[in-house]
Amino acid sequence: EMCIRDRIYQRLDGLNNEDRFGVQAVVNEKGEVEGINEKLLIGAADISLNDLLSRVHEYNGIAIAAHIDRESFSVLSQLGFIEKGTPFDALEVTPFTGLTQARIVYPELDNYSFITSSDAHYLKDIGTALTKIMMEKPTLAELKMAFARQNGRRVLEQ
């Protein structure tokens, strides 16, 4: 069976130019380089947003739109809006905006749960921001319920 990464890779066009975009190292959980990814990962994939989110959910994943408050590399910067009913589980904002301000800046997205995270690109930045979530236990099912605001589970935005 094909994994979601393979489905997306089929729709990515081109090879990476290391001189222009840098090396795309494949790194394991110990920080060891296991290989180099030759695909051009910075490019667009020929897949619709709703199809991508459907695939994520087919694999029991959670779909979170990353740093929607950034002026580049976010769904809002690319599309200009998030269509009502787009099946994101949550929306992430940077610590610079924060959860309280996100509710003010994006009132049209009130039906989504917001989270914030470090969006770390460097080891030293991991854990510099976090989101507190009310759950009974740390499982994916509980996290999904929290994002959906079900059975008392929720993101704590204060």
Give a label for each model feature.
Residues 85-90, 109-113, 130-134:
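Glycine-enriched alpha-helix->loop->beta-strand junction motifs that scaffold or abut catalytic
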Residues 103-109:
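Short, aromatic/basic amphipathic alpha-helical patches
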Residues 112-128:
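Short acidic/histidine-rich active-site segments
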Residues 137-158:
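Mid-to-C-terminal alpha-helical segments outside catalytic/metal-binding sites
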Residues 73-81, 103, 124-137:
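Histidine/acidic-residue-rich catalytic or RNA/ligand-binding cores of hydrolases
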Residues 68, 95, 118-120:
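Active-site metal-binding loops of divalent metal-dependent hydrolases
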Residues 1-90, 97, 107, 142:
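Extended substrate/RNA-proximal surfaces in nucleic-acid metabolism proteins
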